[in-house]
Structures are given as structure tokens and as C-alpha cells.
Amino acid sequence: MKLPATSLFASLALLLGGCSTLSAPFHREPPRPGRTTLGSPLVVVSAQTLDNYLIVEARWDRNGPYHFLVDTGSSVTLVTPALAKRYPSTNATIAATAANAPRVRVRSADGGIAELLPATLRRLELGDAHFDEVPVLIYDCAALSAHLGVKIDGVLGFPLFRETLLTLDYPRSRVVLQPANTTALIPGTTLPLDDANKTPLIHVRLGDRSFVALIDSGSDAPLSLNPVGLEPSFANGPRAGATVGTLTGDRPEQVGRLAETLAIGDFTLPRPIVNLTDELSTVGGAVLRSFSVTFDQEHNRVTFQRDTHDPILSPSQRSAGVSFNKTPAYWRIAGVVPDSPAARAGVQPGDLVTRINGEPIAKWDLTRYEQLIATADHLAFTFLNGTAESEKRIAVFELVP
């Protein structure tokens, strides 16, 4: 799972991806909700696409709306302490078990370990889809909320949808839920899921080599690639990139453009941009957003559908050379890309930014900042030094041409 430090590059390279408990998904079946009920044969939940993530909104009480990020790369569901407190299980046995349970050790995307408290959520609703007695881990989503500019109440892991046919329809900004035994044919390219424990692992191809990758809607990256055994060739890079955050801390990123074509079924991505990893390779939101992706856990298969089979092109990745941890009052520099204009201007980790192009950072949400990076030649950052402010003009550059 990736989590902030916020990497405000062309697309902010961070957050969730591949969070799992140490014993799941590879050694035992992840927990499923106690009961899943669909109020109709087709439940459509509106979603907002932010930085390649699908954020669903749910309303079922006067305390809502609630916002959840859908993370197929996670074998656990996370909720905030406030939501867990509001909806504790009323089942005495379940509640007692959760109250006495030890912290759960969770592995993040970089292989680090964090410990989170377990709980059972009495109720979770997505439109007409009701999930009861949901096993969860408690996590403070404040940093994630600050990054996205939306209050996030939880992260919905893949096992939550075990008893449904789950469709992440990125082009139409929606999530569709159907009964698991739905037999209607789904258009598109269908691939088998590779793991008996229902983890969304598929075989993809790089040139003439096949490898296993996790379908990870909780990552905003296009492809995180473990190069071991593949010996990939690069058209550009790899080079040092963003500072990204995980459950266990910040880490630098290595990014580059491959010289080969990646294939998912019969869909192709020529010369894609990849982030290098020493963990499991993943297909992230920057690629998934081109598709409607349907997960059929009942039959161990996934279907990719889009309106065209034209190659999916990867545009250049532009950057201001800095990554941030965000707060309402300022953005703190979390990392600086080596040999970037920002590094040459003397920007350092820990510096505080209060304004961008003369406007307070409170006026800069995720979408607006991304649009600026995509079009601007320079940015003017105002830095806070004690009680004094100073401005530095930083060139935007192509991190990966």
C-alpha cells in the first residue's frame, strides 16, 4: 500500500498499492464480509476519478457522505477510527474477539511492516449494496485525505467484493456491483486470475516474456515493474524520481520508459513508463483508467474492456522536481529529484511552501496543480523561513520524456 508523502509531480506518484497482511494473500484466504446483500441485480455507484484513483461516495446515515477508495491491490479493508467507533459490531462474540485481538502486521508496497488494530464494522453500504460484519483494520486516513482534497473514510480491499461481480468502470466514473452468479456475457478480453486465493494476479507480456502482475487500483502509477528475470531494455532512464510514501515511510522512486511493448491480453502499451520495484509487479491506475475492468472472483477471471484496441500511449511525465507532505497551511518538501531544476535552486527536504504562483496553497487542489504541471514552463514557490517568506522560480521539466 502506498500512502502520502504526496509526490506532486505530473501525476502525484504515491498512495495505495498492494497492501496485504503478512499471511495474506499468498498463504491463506483473506477474510470476507459476514453478509453481502444487493438490493437489485445491478447496483451502480457513482465514483470520482482523482489522480487515477476511483473514489466512491456512500450515504446511509446523517453523518455522511462517506468517501472510500477502491483498492484491488489490498487484501484488507481499512477504515478510520471514527467510522469504526460509529459502527462497531453488535455481535457479542465478534466484538469480544476483536477487542482482544492483537495488532495485525501489514506489509506495504515497499515490503515494510506496519501494525494496525483490527475491528469489525457492523455496516457498510454502497448504494443498494449492503455489507455486514466487515473485518477491517483501523487506519488514520488524514494524510490520504489531505493529498486527494477529499475526506477519505476508508480503503475498500479486494476481499470485500468476494460475493459480487465487481466492475471498475473508469471511463464512466462508476463502480458496478452484480451478484456473483451472474451469467451474462461480458464484452472484452478475459484473463484467468492466477491465484487460488482470489488475488487479482494476471499474466502480462513484455516483448516475448511473460510475468505475473497484480491488478492494483490502489496505485496511481502505470506499471510498477520488478526487473528480476526480465532484463528490460529502456528507451529513457531509469533515473531517480519522486519520493513516494508507504505505510512504513517514504522511499525514493526509480522511473523510466521501456523500449519494448507491454501487452495485457490483446491490448498493447508501446514503450510504457514504469516505476522499478523489488516487490511484486503491478498494473496501476494510470493504465487501468483506460478500461472498464470486471472481476469475477467466483470463476477466477477478470475482463478488460475498452471501446478501441488502439495502442495505449504513455505521454511524457513532467515534474517540478519536488514532492510534498500536505497540510492545510503549508506543503512540506518531502523529497527533491536529484539533478533537477529544483535541486539546483537549493530546494531541500523540510522546506515549507506557503504559496504557488502567488496564491495560498489552500487554493491548490490536486486537479488544479496537475493541470499547472502539465502546461507551465515555470512555477513560483513561496517558501517560509521563520517569519519571512522568499520566492523561488522553478522550471518544470520532463522527468521521463
Label the model's feature ranges:
Residues 1-5:
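Positively charged n-region of N-terminal signal peptides that target proteins for export
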Residues 7-18:
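Bacterial N-terminal signal peptides
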Residues 19-401:
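Pepsin/retropepsin-fold aspartyl endopeptidases
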